[in-house]
């Protein structure tokens, strides 16, 4: 094992233990670092700021988005900061490299009508359809992340109180309320889930809340496909995914007057600044309503 491989492995283990990041995030870190060192052609101890700047410039010339380039630079900063704090290197070369300035895009979200159509789309009494309905209702009702939904266990659900216990980023737990429609969908799903277990004599792991036909915990990819499938079914042309439903949940709450700090808690954001992006969405919505409704906003006829 080379020094580079040794350092990358140690860094990834450190991230996993300290932050509890998902396997998807860890793979992204690994890919970013391997790509950088393939470019740098030197061991971590010999990396200088000019090498990092050269890598960033190459990424931009390749046509990578500013968001992607900023993420790669963030990975390098975290990596070299770790090596410096552990005494593996004497100077942190990433510390003096300027950030990539990116314009923060407003999150996409569904209209109220489309959100209602989406959660009503699954209507058959089949296991997969009732499961899909419960998933869509829960997304719109709670705003949880796809990784949080896939990680839910039966014991995390309290239908009597209308609450779920969610494990978010860094394995931080929070309690999130569940709406009446989502509760009803979950009850139907749990009943048909039990029938499936008996009917197919599946050797189910009793823990996962959402499972596939084989009784295994549902994956992120499967959930993304479910959301995309029903979005197409109701005629939404833009590509949407689970995160769109998270944005929809937050945006609709704000439009109805919910306090920003309450939304922050529900979403599991560590910082209020992350949640504040939705105030821009709400402002855009208010301007659109004004333009359509206020007499003085209309051109002379």
Curated annotation (Swiss-Prot):
Gene Ontology CC entries for this record: cytoplasm
Active-site residues, as the UniProt record annotates them: 145, 169, 243, 246, 269, 278
Coiled coil: none
Domain Core-binding (CB): 2-84
Alphabetical keyword list: Cell cycle, Cell division, Chromosome partition, Cytoplasm, DNA integration, DNA recombination, DNA-binding
PROSITE patterns noted in UniProt: CB, TYR_RECOMBINASE
Recorded superkingdom: Bacteria
Subcellular compartments: Cytoplasm
Job of this protein: Site-specific tyrosine recombinase, which acts by catalyzing the cutting and rejoining of the recombining DNA molecules. The XerC-XerD complex is essential to convert dimers of the bacterial chromosome into monomers to permit their segregation at cell division. It also contributes to the segregational stability of plasmids.
Subunit description: Forms a cyclic heterotetrameric complex composed of two molecules of XerC and two molecules of XerD.
Protein name as it appears in the record: Tyrosine recombinase XerC
The species this protein was found in: Thermodesulfovibrio yellowstonii (strain ATCC 51303 / DSM 11347 / YP87)
This protein's encoding gene: xerC
């Amino acid at each position: 094992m080379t020094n580079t491989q040794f350092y990358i492995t140690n860094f990834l283990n450190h991230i996993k233990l300290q932050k509890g990041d998902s396997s998807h995030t860890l793979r992204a870190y690994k890919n970013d670092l391997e790509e950088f060192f393939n470019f740098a052609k030197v061991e971590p101890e010999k990396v200088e700021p000019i090498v990092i700047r050269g890598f960033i410039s190459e990424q931009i010339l390749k046509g990578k988005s500013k968001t992607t380039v900023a993420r790669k630079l963030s990975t390098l900063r975290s990596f070299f900061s770790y090596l410096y704090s552990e005494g593996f290197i004497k100077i942190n070369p990433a510390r003096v490299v300027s950030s990539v300035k990116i314009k923060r895009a407003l999150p996409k979200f569904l209209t109220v009508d489309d959100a209602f159509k989406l959660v009503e789309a699954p209507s058959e009494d089949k296991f997969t359809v009732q499961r899909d309905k419960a998933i869509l209702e829960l997304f719109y009702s709670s705003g949880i992340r796809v990784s949080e939904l896939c990680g839910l266990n039966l014991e995390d659900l309290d239908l009597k109180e209308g609450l779920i216990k969610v494990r978010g980023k860094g394995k931080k737990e929070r309690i999130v309320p569940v709406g009446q429609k989502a509760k009803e969908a979950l009850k139907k799903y749990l009943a048909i889930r039990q029938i499936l277990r008996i009917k197919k004599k599946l050797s189910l792991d009793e823990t996962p809340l959402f499972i596939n036909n084989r009784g295994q915990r549902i994956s992120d990819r499967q959930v993304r496909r479910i959301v995309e499938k029903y979005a197409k079914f109701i005629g939404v042309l833009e590509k949407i995914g689970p995160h769109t439903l998270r944005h929809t949940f937050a945006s609709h709450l704000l439009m109805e007057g919910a306090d920003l700090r309450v939304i922050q808690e529900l979403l599991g954001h560590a910082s209020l600044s992350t949640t504040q992006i939705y105030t821009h969405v709400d402002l855009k919505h208010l301007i659109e309503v004004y333009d359509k409704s206020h007499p003085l906003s209309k051109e002379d006829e």
